[in-house]
Structures are given as C-alpha cells and as structure tokens.
Amino acid sequence: MSSTYGENLHLTIFGQSHSPAIGVTVEGIPAGEDVDRDELQRFLDRRAPGKNVWSTPRKEADAPEILSGLVNGYTCGAPLTAIIRNTNTRSQDYANLAVTPRPGHADYTAEVKYDGYQDRAGGGHFSGRLTAPRCIVGGICLQILAREGITLVSRIASIAGITDEGELTGSLAGKEFPIVSDARGEEMREAIAQAREAGDSVGGVIECAIFGAPAGLGDPMFGGMENRIASAVFGIPAVKGIEFGAGFGVASLRGSEDNDAFTVENGKIVTETNHCGGILGGITNGMPIVFRAAFKPTPSIAREQQSVNLQTMVPEKMAVTGRHDPCIVPRAVPCVEAAAAIAVYDAYLSRKREMR
C-alpha cells in the first residue's frame, strides 16, 4: 500500500480502523523543535469522532502516545513515532462485507487489489480513521510553521449546496464549525440533520488559506506547490476535487481579467488580485495560498442500495449498518489543514536547503 508521503519529511501511516492502534512514523523534523502537547491535543480534538450531532456516534479519545522522537518536549532528530489506540470498535457491523461491497466505498476495489486479504472492518486502511495520525504530524507542522510566521485558516465553504458568505479570515481559526455567516451555518446544520433523519448523507467544500508563506516555495512541473498540496489533500478519504485560487472559474475569464497585476506594498512585491491562489509556475509568489477541496457525501448510509454478491454474482439490495457521519466535512477541516501544513513545511525545508 502507498502510505508514505514527503520529500524532506518522510511520513508513513500505519494501522486500520479496527486494529489495536493506528499511527505514524515521520523522519526529517529537525532537532530542537518545541511541541506543545496541549495545543496538539486541541487540534486532534477538532477531528475526533463522537463529539457533536453531525459526527459519528463512535467515541474515541484520540490521545496520541508519542513513542520516540521527542525528549523533554522537543524533537530530538530521531524518527518520531506516535500511535492512537482504537478503543471503541464494533467489527461485527461489517461481517456482511466479505461478499457484498458497499457502493461508494473502496470495498470492491480493495477486494480486486488485495485478493480478499484486506481488512474490511470499518474500511480497514482505507478508513477516514487514518486521518488521525496524519493530524498528529500536521499539528506539529502547524506549530513549527507558526513560529516562522506562516499560519493556516480554513472554513466550511459549503455543505449540501448551501454556500457560506463573506471572506475567510483568521478569526475562524480553531472553531468547531468554522463559517463566516451564522445564518448559513444554521442552514448547513439543518441539512445535515435532515440527511441523518433520512438515513442519508451530504458532502461539501472546505476552503483553506495559508498566510505568510514566502515567495520561492515549490518547483516547476511535478514538484509544484499545487502538486504537493494536492497529493497530500487527496490522501484524505472522500476528497474528489481540488482547485487553487479562482480555480475552474478562470476558464470563463479573459487573460486581462485573470492576470494578477503586480504592485509594490511596503517595499514588497504583491499582486492586486489573487486569482492564481498564491502560486505561479508551481512556485509561491508570497501572496496567500488559497485552495478548496470537494468532499463527497459519506458513502455509508442506512438507505437501501444495490450491490452485487461477489460469490453468486447476483445483484442484491443492502443497507449499511454501523456508526457513520451524516456529513464528514466539519471533522475534515483539521485534516485539510494538516495535509496543507505537511506539504508546505516539506517545501519550506527544501527552500532552506536551497538557500544554504
């Protein structure tokens, strides 16, 4: 399985949704970086399940056990390994998946890829549960980046077609349900509640902005900043699309409208607009990096759906049991921040080496 990411940071995710523990090993974090464990736990709590009405009923503390790489609160240069114990699993809910794959899940493709040897319980290694160890590394990267003057802020841009209003600002940082318009937020929550009541689910879009990233991060072609961020973000289950800056909207603009005019502000080169999302030619230009990620509705729903019995090759109806989110978007916000932080810090380390 491809569970490793990074050029300077090398992180490997391990475990399954219902295994005794899930975890991560990361190499490449320089020695001497201060890790605030309380701040890290607060970040992980934003992703943790079972804490609100729009989340799965599965309750997990998501308290990380750091086994190596940290001494007296500082990174020591050795590989950092951390685990999170799985304490609230119900594998019996997935007994029927051995022969009947769930629509919208990786059950069928995993069956083909791994000849039936994959762990099916809770989605195994394909589960969104595996975003928790990624958030450990992302949370640490966020702390390091903040000390370098680089901050990340995200919001729920839309849920079930209900779009937030206003501009993304730092005031939303760390909020459980980060939206600008309280009225639109209530509409989103109501849409989630209605989907849950109907045994269904809804998706949405998360917008993320990275402030303070210096010009010069990233490379042309395959090492571009968009490539790095997209690769990390697509590692989050349920992500089906990503766009930077004005995104697909640029296709309807003229060049004179899309081009971000350069100017000088306080002795620094800036652009008057930011249609490019802070990236030109794969390299950051010093403006905020802005992107949006689209999340599909949670595929585990209680409504009856059609599948196929893989033993008899006969179509049959099924309804998914177990505990699942009617909307994954609110809990996915810190996952997007973690992915972006890892990608940006990895590129930041590359730039530091280039400038030596």
Predicted region positions:
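Short acidic, glycine/tyrosine-flanked loop/strand segments centered on an H-E-D-like triad
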Residues: A98-G124, Q306-H324
